[in-house]
Amino acid sequence: MNQKQVNKLIKLLKEKEISFDSGLTDNEIEKINHNFGIIFPNDLKLLLQTELPVSSGFVHWRYGINSEKGKQEIENKLNWPLEGMLFDIKNNSFWLDEWGSKPSDFISQKKIAQDELTKQPKLIPIYSHRYLSGEPNEVGNPVFSVYQMDIIHYGNDLMDYFTNEFGIELPKSFGTIDKPKKIRFWSEMIDLNNEIIE
């Protein structure tokens, strides 16, 4: 995703009444990295540094580094995938074989799940419960919809995601990615869900 494409994307999103603030500065990006342990892949970084989407549902990163309430909101978004997993462990018998035998008590289950999730690629919140994989740190990572362990692809990459979420139509010259990149753990959860459905 280049600057021209980002500018066009922002223009189309504004036509859908998405509000934007001035883009994040290099200093703000560094603070986000320091406060939340997030390194934005370059396509997302380019978008956020060009103009920052601030409509309801979007992550207001600037607010998150300038207020305790904003920081808590971002931490809640970052913890959403774990909280959803824990809900399914407690209420829906979710457990992965590779984690070993499932302990009988929830406190032990929670500890194992937390430890296992910290080993996986970090998910960066974009909008509502949509997340971009932070790994690998490169352009073109898929966007996931995460609701408990009901995880699906919501975009093969960032551009594809915005067309799906907001019904915008990008010029054909932008090109498309035919299938999403495989992301350790998260893509496996989608495959697992598909097996259950089949």
Language model segments and positions:
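Residues that flank catalytic or metal-binding motifs in active/ligand-binding sites
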Residues: Q120-K122, G140
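A short secondary-structure junction signal
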Residues: S108-I112, G134-P142
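A surface-exposed partner-binding patch
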Residues: M1-L117, I124, S128
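Glycine-rich, aromatic-bearing surface loops/beta-hairpins
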Residues: N137-E195
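Extended serine/threonine-enriched, polar tracts that run as long, contiguous segments within proteins
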Residues: H129-S133
